[in-house]
Amino acid sequence: AIVDVRSSPYSQYKSEFNKEHLKDSLKKNNITYVFLGEECGARVSDKSCYTNGKVDYSLVAKTDLFKTGIQRLINGADKYSLALMCAEKDPITCHRTILICRNLIKEGIIIKHVLENGDIELHEDSEKRLLKLFKLHHPDLFRTEQERLNEAYARQGEKIAYEAEDQKELI
């Protein structure tokens, strides 16, 4: 099954990636299409999930709606091979990794990312790249690897998170 986690299931540049067209194409190939953009999308409507006008993934992860989406993914993984679909090419620049997969691995789900060139990257390797991105990959006397990884996730989340165009949207 393809699980679309885009907040808006439409492409400005490639109409074949619009929800209806994609759903029909996948159905012809016996692949189920599921839209979870409301539950797991990067642009959340819950105003309490914003800090200074930007989505805060640590707050999103605590919402009932997001937890429902994660549970649907866990349940779906029992029945199907799932592929999460979004718009970013590199897993570490997408909320798929920084928000969704981070929470799925806590539930014991094995994550493999398909890279732009078709190669497969284990989630652990994505996390290593994330640590390197912020120069947190070297051992530290004062912090565990998990603490450094948490910092890398937080910093990347801040970097890539959706920012409300109009702060009035959040009032």
Label the predicted regions.
Residues A1-I171:
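Residues lining hydrophobic/aromatic ligand-binding pockets adjacent to catalytic sites
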